[in-house]
């Protein structure tokens, strides 16, 4: 599935924020085709075919948190705001990383490192956590255990 081909299913819902794991580079997407005007976007990836795309609409803007740690490349702390609201957002696409950490461990350690970012009145954590009960093992990171 390509987001540029499947976006029509989402836009009737009039989203303010979209987190799109496995999203191709935004440069490949004709944003003018969207029925909703994109206010801002952020994309990170290792190749042009797969990355993490964040899109905002309805006046919301995106700013990368100043203490972003690329050790957690696909766990993006972003400040999302419009004229009246501000949210701290963690957009996630947990995937295999060097060092042998499980997906949920990687997420858990990132949330620990971003503790001060998460200490905000309005926090959203969303995306593809790649977590499933059938994969659960005893984690070295207990706050993420199910």
Where are these regions (language model features)?
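Metal-dependent phosphoesterases centered on the DNase I-like endonuclease/exonuclease/phosphatase
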Residues: 17, 33, 106-146
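Proline-aspartate-enriched helix->loop->beta-strand connector
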Residues: 14-20
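Glycine-rich phosphate-binding loop signature in dinucleotide/nucleotide-binding domains
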Residues: 12-13, 82-84, 116-121
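Short, flexible loop segments at the rims of nucleotide/cofactor-binding pockets, characterized by
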Residues: 1, 65-68, 100-105
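Short, acidic/polar
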Residues: 2-12
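Internal catalytic-core helix/loop-beta-alpha segment
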Residues: 78-80, 89-119
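Structured beta-strand-rich core segments of catalytic domains in phosphoester-bond hydrolases
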Residues: 21-96
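Active-site metal-binding loops of divalent metal-dependent hydrolases
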Residues: 1, 23, 94, 128-129
């Amino acid at each position: 599935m390509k987001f540029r081909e499947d976006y029509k299913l989402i836009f009737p819902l009039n989203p303010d924020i979209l987190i799109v794991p496995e999203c191709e580079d935004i440069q490949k997407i004709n944003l003018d085709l969207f029925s909703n005007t994109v206010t801002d976007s952020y994309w990170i990836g290792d190749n042009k075919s797969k990355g993490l795309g964040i899109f905002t609409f309805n006046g919301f803007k995106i700013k990368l948190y100043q203490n972003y740690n690329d050790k957690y490349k696909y766990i993006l702390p972003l400040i999302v705001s419009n004229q009246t609201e501000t949210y701290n957002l963690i957009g996630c696409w947990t995937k295999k990383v060097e060092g042998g950490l499980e997906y949920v461990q990687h997420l858990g350690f990132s949330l620990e490192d971003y503790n001060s970012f998460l200490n905000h009145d309005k926090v959203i954590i969303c995306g593809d956590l790649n977590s499933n009960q059938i994969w659960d093992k005893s984690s070295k990171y207990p706050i993420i255990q199910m």
